[in-house]
Swiss-Prot record:
Organism: Geobacillus stearothermophilus (Bacillus stearothermophilus)
The name this protein goes by in its record: Alanine carboxypeptidase
Keyword Protease: yes
GO MF, one example: metallocarboxypeptidase activity
Keywords: Carboxypeptidase, Hydrolase, Protease
Reactions mediated catalytically: Release of a C-terminal alanine from a peptide or a variety of pteroyl or acyl groups
Length: 30
């Protein structure tokens, strides 16, 4: 099940990158 953990980490990293970019955009608007 190592592939499952790795895939979850990859998805988590993508969400973190997406969230940080969204936060930067929102800060730019405010």
């Amino acid at each position: 099940k190592a592939w499952f953990v790795l895939s979850m980490r990859a998805v988590g990293g993508l969400f973190v990158d997406l969230w940080t970019s969204v936060a930067k955009t929102v800060k730019g608007w405010l």
